[in-house]
Amino acid sequence: MFGVRSATVRFGHTLALDDVTVEVPGGSVVAVVGGDGAGKSTLLRALAGEVPLDGGTIEAPPKQRLGYLPALAGSWAALTVKQNIDFVAGIYGLAGEELTARRAELLDRASLTPAAGRLAARLSGGMRRKLGFIMAIVHRPALLILDEPSTGVDPVSRIDLWRLVSEAAASGTAVLMSTTYLDEAERAAQLVVLDSGRILVQGSYDQVLAGFAGVVTQTDEPVRAEWAWRQGRVQHEYWPGAGPPPGITVVAPDLEDIVIALSLVRRNEVLS
């Protein structure tokens, strides 16, 4: 079991993580969601050993057994896809027939075999993210940390990336990933919702839905603008305590509604 316990991280006067505990079991995917500045990247970087804790503990494998794909993962632009993979694989001692087989397997899984000889500089954004994923997992890590692996990529590449994530977990790897796509988060075994460095809720998708209190309504004109947000062409409004006035349509909240509503509760608590 990998993860962080009571993790606290400060950047100057800013509390980036505030007493955060997250467990990442082997063979499962834990998805971290939240708005900008929620602490998602800080949590992942802390577990990857890139950011020191000011308090709490980390349980992580040695560097040789850890795979990490940062939000701005870089490949070597002047190297081909194959050369990028081989360079990273060599750091972990993969060579010869073992490397050849592993490279071919991952290129096929990522639909990158036709691009194996292409310079990384000439790849699309989605192809670069898939290459970064391969470089993070080529050595079969025990813990795989992915910072928004599918942000900004095309729909087909998103499908490829999620398949790769699922296959990694199925092989026994513990996967911790942040994502801006809540449909991806819903597929994870566990969700962690962060806001301003604090956990608002965590658990399985079903547990998060079942534990959500209050009512969400749909309206063209919200009664209280500070509790409302746009959802497509309409607005949703959260009623954490007393129910809405008569005549307002109540809707079943989805994960996006829950994340926004909990964030609004947190921010109104801070302001009060």
In which residue ranges do the predicted regions lie?
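ABC transporter nucleotide-binding domain
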Residues: 160-239
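Conserved structural motif at the start of ABC-family nucleotide-binding domains
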Residues: 2-4, 17
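The feature captures the beta-strand-to-loop junction immediately N-terminal to the Walker
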Residues: 33-35
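Conserved ABC ATPase signature
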Residues: 78, 119-126
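ABC ATPase C-loop
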Residues: 137-138
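Catalytic Walker B motif of ABC-type/P-loop ATPase nucleotide-binding domains
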Residues: 144-148
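Helix-to-loop junction immediately C-terminal to a conserved catalytic motif
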Residues: 48
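Conserved ABC ATPase "signature" region
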Residues: 86, 90, 97-115
